[in-house]
Each structure stands twice: as structure tokens, then as C-alpha cells.
């Protein structure tokens, strides 16, 4: 019989690698910027592992695969290995990775646990139990096969001998070679016998094999005489045996007696140069295959997200019943779906999470998505559905048009939840869920703001007290105490010295005059603007006297409590752009003036660092979801009158990066367009540097009827007949307000889409009239919306209009230059946005404008605090009032947040409870822990 034909693994693997190189080149041409990527994780420094890894790295480089070698020290623990595996699992740029075995660590590491932690879709070594199970079941197209058996199969196929119907014998049953080889041959239709160390009459079993694969690790165990004449012999062994003829005294042999076997076999692999090169080639092939699978599923920039189907009911159930009827997906799953890494997410149970700012750093080079702001016409006291429209729009864009989309909304105050307003999370089939989580503590951000705010308040009164009761020297000694005989200034004290122009760092060198300036803030109690806060509606805290305890030695003063969301710290949170920026803004907050008229800041009080510590978690946006499973950031909830009424810049920026250039971020501005939208543009966008693409202007038939002269609308009372019967004349008259708000939006150079939020009492004629008039007067489009009753389906036309508008030309511009005098900036807003003839600065406002300008705050943007129920200062004036002078009663400063807020009327910053508060209906089921009674 002629000697066996040699199956040259080097030559065959070279051909495979050449094909792979061509495939990689084609992939890169098809998807510019795309490169298949392999990662190899090694623990320790074994010489044999280093050798194998170098061979793999070289092969990857030759083919065009980007290979990364992660080498961990021998001191590495199992948990540390697991962290790296988790990171590689979540890294979408890594298409395959392997853990080099054995793990060379001083610590005990469970290899099986480590291997099975690898995501099966990235397990290019094919060693996880999932891939092994799929191989055993014959799912060859849905698993990765261990590289050595896969290479053996390629060598067998190279012979041209059909596998089907042949009797194959596998000697060895290891998880890496023998067992998967058995499965692979079986599902290629061979009849397979597996032999092992306990097999009786091994020579007889081997002699039955038309195909023989040997992987025992025993040098030349299988003798030539065992081989069936004409068999295909695949030898996986690499063994070192003594050989005096070799320079190093040893030679490499396989598990088969090669010289004997080649005389009986028809095909045989040499050792070395047979199976070994094929193993590396198969690793490369699996990596390229994984990259291809990734591209098949992956549409550039598209999330692979699972949406929830709504079970729509008529009549529409209560908000809380709808919220409970839809089971939210685990928030960790949603985070993964939208491209967040596990180390960027802090889970707060199953339905809410915080997102770390490191996500923004990771994605900083990704282009932003389309930026949409939802606002409204001047509303009725009932509200016109901006929040519901925001949620309905994102559900339509995401669950129905399959766009990457994020909603960014404000966190509601807990006070109104128990007061008169009830819950706020959208409504009907357009909600953020779970509703009770959204409306109650959420992740504690407002509690953190309350704690931080009240720390400042406590610091103010404590400082006044201590300065009144101590000499300069005693005060200085307590502010800069001697520790172990040494006095040192803290960092915050050194910064205060520099602001005072005292360039000294040694406390012992200060003069008496410098000690006086440093130690005394000399706060004028009459100028204190900082109030204590509480997230509860409590009317009896609107004016209080503090300091009545005997220990305060008669140092009393009149003060008040505000609702927590009225705190400047909430506005700081909403406008900050980074942790560093927040630290700076908190320090800049002006709490009072000194008796010399100089501003006193939180930094002067020495409290700004502590405030940052209290706020370090609150700065992270809160991730929740809509009923239909689209992501929502709930973050910050500043007042829309004395503050700017918008959710946080940080949430918007992270969301814009996550959705990518083709996606959408939809955020909501408080109150009507004359207030919330104007502040969104002139304050929020000015600080964020973000450029909006579309304004969605929400209008309702009932609001237009009110502006057209309809009867007064009162919350809690039935609507008058004029609002539930068709009246086209009232609608057309009231369109004047919507027309003005369209003009206001277009003043900033942004396309406007009018969303006509339909109610069951509206007629088609009324809805069509609003849409037609809107388009005639400058709206890009105007569409009827039924998202309250139908969820995303009811906002589909709106979503399509927003998509078109986002592609339309725009030229975003701000309304005024910050360098203008304070009075001129106020006048521009009053005349252009409200339609006032002029403004009148009353004496207190005139004085404050001069003081703030002198203190260096004149270049801040303006945040108008006026009624939201009219374009004018008079809430009774509907439509578009004309011929009025806007009175400015006072001007106050939120220096840390970064704006001045003129007061047009009196503003309540602490709501009260009504006769029958919402809490009458709120309770907890002790068995299910279900919250009952929220709207």
C-alpha cells in the first residue's frame, strides 16, 4: 500500500488565512471605520502561554484583525478577572475574545466559572457551556465550535472523502477536543465512536475507524498496526520525548506512531505542522464570523431594543391602572439595549437606575442626535398635555418608527403629589413607569438638594451668631485651629484669602486687619436671600421666626421655608455641565450681602465642598422607561417661574450621544412657550451650547376657546358647555395666542410643529381648523394627536412631522446679547415675546439692577418670573394682550445657577394643602406593598 498523503496544516491554514484577509478587506470597504476585533485575556506569565498568544497576535495582524492582549499579573483574583470579562462582553467594538488557559494565578480561580462568564456570542474559542450545548444539539450555525476540532474537520474535508456514512473514531474525550470532535462529526453525518482511558480493546475500536482523530496527550499511544487500512488519521497531539540527536535533547511527536501509521493510512497529519496551524486559523475564522454576525444584526447607530406592546382599552383606565398593567422591563436590560456599559449604570432596584457621567466621556466623539423641545401655548389651569405629548412622541419615534429616541423630563416635586396636583408622569397610554416610583422618592435627588440647601441655611445663621458673640482673635482661632501645634488653612480658606487679595498661606503671618477681613463675613441679615426648604406643601412655613431658643441669646430673625424644587441648588443641578462645573456653581451661589454691600457666597461660608459631596450622586441622571419601553431620563425639576423650568443639561447631553446622529432627544419646557421655551433657548441652550432642531408646540381646542373669550376654566370643576360643544368661532378667535407662540418659536430660527392634543369632546372641524390656521401662519406642520388614548400609535403623524422638520433648514439664534444692560435684556423679552409696549422698573427693581451690575452680575441671562396664565402680567388677560406696560417689582439673583430673575408679580414658593389633599386617597397594601391612590 502506498504511503499516506500528508495533510499539510501549514499550507491549508495559509490558504484559509488568505481568504480571511480578503473577507476582512471587504468588510472594511463595506463599512468604513469597521474592523473585526479580537481580545486575549491572560493571567500570569507562563512561557507556553506567551508563545501561543504571540502566534495568535501575529496571525490576527496578518489578516487585518485588530487584536488586543490584556495581560494581568499573577496576583489577580477571580473577581478582577470577572470585571475584565464583563467589560469585554459589553464592549461592542470587541467581536470575539478568549481567556488563555491555564490561568496562572497565586489565587484560586474557578476556570469553569470564568469561561462561562464569556458572552456566548463572543466566545470564539467555543468553550462556554452554551456553545458546547448548542454543538451537542446540532445547532452548528448558531454557536462557536472549539478551534482544534473545527480545524480537524477542515483537514478531513480537505481529503475530499465524504464524511457522511463513515465510521469515525475519536480517541480522547476532553472538553476542548475529544467531546466537541465527537459532536462535530456526528452532525456531519458520521457514525461516531468515542474512546477513552477506560475503553476495553482500544486497538480493536481504533481499527474500525474510517476516520480517526486522536487527542490523548500520550506520545505515540496509537500504534500503526491499529490503523484501519486507508483511514484518514488526524493527530492532535503535541508531546516532547527525549532524543539525543536533537540539540535540545528532545523531539516533538504526536499521539500516533507516525512512521508506522503513514504506511497504513490514506491521509495523515504530521506533527508538528498538521493540526496546530489549523487551530490558530480557526480562531481567526471564528473572529471574522463573529464580526459578520455583529454587522448582520447591527445597523450603524441603531439600538437593538425590545419594545412593549400596549393593550389599549376603551374607556381609558386611570393612569395608575395603566401603569400597573404594563410590566416594565428590567432597567439593567434597557441600559444594555441603549448602549450603556454596566460600570456606567447604578441600579436602584429593577425599574430605575442612575447613569454615571463617565458615559459622556466615553461617547464624547460620537455626533449628537436631533434635539427636540416640547412646549405649549398659554395654558388653561388644567394644562394642555405637554408631558403626555413628550412621552407619546418618543413612544411613536421609538416603538413605531424604530428610531433611537430618548425623553428627558423633569423630576416632579413630592409636595404636590400629596397636595392638589397628584402624580405627574404623562398620562393615559403615554406615561413614564412605574408611576409611583416616578412621583415619590425616585433615587433621592430632591432629598439631597434639601439637605444641601439647609446646610447652607444653617451655615449662614451659625456664622452670624458666632461673629456676633466672638472677638476677631477668638473667631480666627476657631476657624483655623491649631492641630498638634500647627495651624493650617484648608483649601477653601486659601481660596477665600486669594479673593480678598491676601497672598499668604501661613496663618501665623496674617496682620490684625487681615484676620478681621478673613474671619468676618459681616452678613447683613436684611439682605439674606437664602431660605430653608422642604419637599412638602406646608403653608405655615411661609413665614417663621428662627432663633427663639435661649441658647441663641436673642438673635432672632424672620425667615421662611420654600418648597425644595425652588432651591437655587435645583437650578444649579439642571444647568451644570460637569462635576467640576457644579462645584464651581455651588460655590458661586450668593446668599446675602455684607454690610458693605459685597456679595457673600457659599464659597465664603466654606460650605461649597460639602455641598458637592452631598450632590455627587444627584448629578447622575435617573434612567426610567415609558409604557412602550423607550428610555427616559428623569433629572432635575427647577421651578418654571423663579427658575428656568427645564430638565438637566447633563441628561440631554448624555442622551444626545446615546441616540447617535440619526436619533432624537425630546425634552419638555415648563409652562407656555413665552416662559419655558424662551428660557430653554436663552438660558439652557446658552449654557449647554446645544442647538435644537425642532419645536413641538402643544395646543388644545379648549385652550384656544378660552383665549377666544370662553368662560373661565377652573381646576376641579366641570368644563362649561362652550368647551364641550363645537364652536369654530371661539377657536378661530383664540388662535391668536397660538399664532403668537408660533411667532415666538420662529424668532429663534427653529421649525415649529404644532401638536393638536385631541380630547373626546373635540370635533374634527375644530381640530382641522387649528391645523390649517397653524400651517397658514408659519408652522412647519400641524397634526392631530391621540396619544393619551392610543400611546405611540396616536402620535405617529406627529413623529413623522418631527422627522421631516428635523431635516429642514434652520438657523438657531439667541434673543439678546448678555453684554446688554439688565433693563434692556428684560425689555427685549417683554416686547418681543410677550408683546408689551414697554417695561417699568419699580424702585426696588431699579435698585437691584444697579446693585447686581455693580457686583459684577449684570452679564447674566434673564429668567422672567411672571404668571404662566397670560402673555401679560395679568392672568385674566387671555389671547394676545396689547397696549400694556410690564411692571418689574423686584430683581433677584441666582448667581450659582447663572441668571437674574425679575419678579413681575408675587410668586408663591411654598404651596399649601387644600381642604381635601390627595393624601386622603393614598395608601399601601401591606400584603403586596402596592401603592394605591395615585392618579
From Swiss-Prot:
PROSITE patterns xrefs: FTHFS_1, FTHFS_2, THF_DHG_CYH_1, THF_DHG_CYH_2
Modified residues (N-acetylmethionine): 1
Keywords in alphabetical order: Acetylation, ATP-binding, Cytoplasm, Disease variant, Hydrolase, Ligase, Multifunctional enzyme, NADP, Nucleotide-binding, One-carbon metabolism, Oxidoreductase, Phosphoprotein
One Pfam short name: THF_DHG_CYH_C
Recorded superkingdom: Eukaryota
Record HAMAP family: FTHFS, THF_DHG_CYH
This protein's name: C-1-tetrahydrofolate synthase, cytoplasmic
UniProt organism field: Homo sapiens
Amino acid at each position: 500500500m502506498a504511503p499516506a498523503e500528508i495533510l499539510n496544516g501549514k499550507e491549508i491554514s495559509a490558504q484559509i488565512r488568505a481568504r480571511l484577509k480578503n473577507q476582512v478587506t471587504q468588510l472594511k470597504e463595506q463599512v468604513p471605520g469597521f474592523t473585526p476585533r479580537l481580545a486575549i485575556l491572560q493571567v500570569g506569565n507562563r512561557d507556553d502561554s506567551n508563545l501561543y498568544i504571540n502566534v495568535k497576535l501575529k496571525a490576527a495582524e496578518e489578516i487585518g484583525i485588530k487584536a488586543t492582549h490584556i495581560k494581568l499579573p499573577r496576583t489577580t483574583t477571580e473577581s478582577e478577572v470577572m470585571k475584565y470579562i464583563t467589560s469585554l462582553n459589553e464592549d461592542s467594538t470587541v467581536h470575539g475574545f478568549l481567556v488563555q488557559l491555564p490561568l496562572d494565578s497565586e489565587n484560586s480561580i474557578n476556570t469553569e466559572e470564568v469561561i462561562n462568564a464569556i458572552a456566548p456570542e463572543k466566545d470564539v474559542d467555543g468553550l462556554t457551556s452554551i456553545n458546547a450545548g448548542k454543538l451537542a444539539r446540532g445547532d452548528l450555525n448558531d454557536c462557536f465550535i472549539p478551534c482544534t476540532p473545527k480545524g480537524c474537520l477542515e483537514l478531513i474535508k480537505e481529503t475530499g472523502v465524504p464524511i457522511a456514512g463513515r465510521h469515525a473514531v475519536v480517541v480522547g474525550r476532553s472538553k476542548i477536543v475529544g467531546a466537541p470532535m465527537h459532536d462535530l462529526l456526528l452532525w456531519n453525518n458520521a457514525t461516531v465512536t468515542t474512546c477513552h482511558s477506560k475503553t476495553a480493546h482500544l486497538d480493536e475500536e481504533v481499527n474500525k475507524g474510517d476516520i480517526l482523530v486522536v487527542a490523548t496527550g500520550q506520545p505515540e499511544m496509537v500504534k500503526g498496526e491499529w490503523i484501519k487500512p486507508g483511514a484518514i488519521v488526524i493527530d492532535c497531539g503535541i508531546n516532547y520525548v527525549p532524543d539525543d540527536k536533537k540539540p535540545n535533547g528532545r523531539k516533538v511527536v504526536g499521539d500516533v506512531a507516525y512512521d508506522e501509521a503513514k504506511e497504513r493510512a490514506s491521509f495523515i497529519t504530521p506533527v508538528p505542522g498538521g493540526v496546530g496551524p489549523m487551530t490558530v486559523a480557526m480562531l481567526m475564522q471564528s473572529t471574522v464570523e463573529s464580526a459578520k454576525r455583529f454587522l448582520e444584526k447591527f445597523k450603524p447607530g441603531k439600538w437593538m431594543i425590545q419594545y412593549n406592546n400596549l393593550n389599549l382599552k376603551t374607556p381609558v383606565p386611570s393612569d395608575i391602572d395603566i401603569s400597573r398593567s404594563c410590566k416594565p422591563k428590567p432597567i439593567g436590560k434597557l441600559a444594555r439595549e441603549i448602549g450603556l456599559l454596566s460600570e456606567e449604570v447604578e441600579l436602584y432596584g429593577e425599574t430605575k437606575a442612575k447613569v454615571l457621567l463617565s458615559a459622556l466621556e466615553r461617547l464624547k466623539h460620537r455626533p449628537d442626535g436631533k434635539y427636540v423641545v416640547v412646549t405649549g401655548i398659554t395654558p388653561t389651569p388644567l394644562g394642555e398635555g405637554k408631558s403626555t405629548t413628550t412621552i407619546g412622541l418618543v413612544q411613536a419615534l421609538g416603538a413605531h418608527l424604530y428610531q433611537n429616541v430618548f425623553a428627558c423630563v423633569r423630576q416632579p416635586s413630592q409636595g404636590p403629589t400629596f397636595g392638589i396636583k397628584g402624580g405627574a408622569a404623562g398620562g393615559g397610554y403615554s406615561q413614564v413607569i412605574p408611576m409611583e416610583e416616578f412621583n415619590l422618592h425616585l433615587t433621592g435627588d430632591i432629598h439631597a438638594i434639601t439637605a444641601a440647601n439647609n446646610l447652607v441655611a444653617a451655615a449662614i445663621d451659625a456664622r452670624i451668631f458666632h461673629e456676633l458673640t466672638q472677638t476677631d482673635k477668638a473667631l480666627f482661632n476657631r476657624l483655623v485651629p491649631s492641630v498638634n501645634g500647627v495651624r493650617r488653612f484648608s483649601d477653601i480658606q486659601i481660596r477665600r484669602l486669594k479673593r480678598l487679595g491676601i497672598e499668604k498661606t501661613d496663618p501665623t503671618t496674617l496682620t490684625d486687619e487681615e484676620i478681621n477681613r478673613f474671619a468676618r463675613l459681616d452678613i447683613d441679615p436684611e439682605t439674606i436671600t437664602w431660605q430653608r426648604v422642604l419637599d412638602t406643601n406646608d403653608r405655615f412655613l411661609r413665614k417663621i421666626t428662627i432663633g427663639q431658643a435661649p441658647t441663641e441669646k436673642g438673635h432672632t430673625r424672620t425667615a421662611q421655608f420654600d418648597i425644595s424644587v425652588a432651591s437655587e441648588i435645583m437650578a444649579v443641578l439642571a444647568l451644570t455641565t460637569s462635576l467640576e462645573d457644579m462645584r464651581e456653581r455651588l460655590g458661586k451661589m450668593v446668599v446675602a450681602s455684607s454690610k458693605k454691600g459685597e456679595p457673600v457666597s457659599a464659597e465664603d461660608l466654606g460650605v461649597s465642598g460639602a455641598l458637592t459631596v452631598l450632590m455627587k450622586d444627584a448629578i447622575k441622571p435617573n434612567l426610567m422607561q415609558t409604557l412602550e419601553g423607550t428610555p427616559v431620563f428623569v433629572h432635575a425639576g427647577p421651578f418654571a417661574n423663579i427658575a428656568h423650568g427645564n430638565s438637566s443639561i447633563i441628561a440631554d447631553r448624555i442622551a444626545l450621544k446615546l441616540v447617535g446622529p440619526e436619533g432624537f432627544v425630546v425634552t419638555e419646557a415648563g409652562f407656555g412657550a413665552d416662559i419655558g421655551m424662551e428660557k430653554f433657548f436663552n438660558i439652557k441652550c446658552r449654557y449647554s451650547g446645544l442647538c435644537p432642531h425642532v419645536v413641538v408646540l402643544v395646543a388644545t381646542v379648549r385652550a384656544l376657546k378660552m383665549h377666544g373669550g370662553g368662560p373661565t376654566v377652573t381646576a376641579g370643576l366641570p368644563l362649561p358647555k362652550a368647551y364641550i360643544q363645537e364652536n369654530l368661532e371661539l377657536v378661530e378667535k383664540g388662535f391668536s395666542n397660538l399664532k403668537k407662540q408660533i411667532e415666538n418659536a420662529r424668532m429663534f430660527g427653529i421649525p415649529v410643529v404644532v401638536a393638536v392634543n385631541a380630547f373626546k369632546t373635540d370635533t374634527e372641524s375644530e381640530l382641522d381648523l387649528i391645523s390649517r390656521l397653524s400651517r397658514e401662519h408659519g408652522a412647519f406642520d400641524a397634526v392631530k394627536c391621540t396619544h393619551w388614548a392610543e400611546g405611540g400609535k396616536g402620535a405617529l403623524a406627529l413623529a413623522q412631522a418631527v422627522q421631516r422638520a428635523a431635516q429642514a433648514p434652520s438657523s438657531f439664534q439667541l434673543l439678546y446679547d448678555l453684554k446688554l444692560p439688565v433693563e434692556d435684556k428684560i425689555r427685549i423679552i417683554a416686547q418681543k415675546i410677550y408683546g408689551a409696549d414697554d417695561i417699568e422698573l419699580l424702585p426696588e427693581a431699579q435698585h437691584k439692577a444697579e446693585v447686581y451690575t455693580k457686583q459684577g452680575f449684570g452679564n447674566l441671562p434673564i429668567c422672567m418670573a411672571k404668571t404662566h396664565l397670560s402673555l401679560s402680567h395679568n392672568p385674566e388677560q387671555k389671547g394676545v394682550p396689547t397696549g400694556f406696560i410690564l411692571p418689574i417689582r423686584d430683581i433677584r439673583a441666582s448667581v450659582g445657577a447663572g441668571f437674574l430673575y425679575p419678579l413681575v408679580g408675587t410668586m408663591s414658593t411654598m404651596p399649601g394643602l387644600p381642604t381635601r389633599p390627595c393624601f386622603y386617597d393614598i395608601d399601601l397594601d401591606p400584603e403586596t406593598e402596592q401603592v394605591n391612590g395615585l392618579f
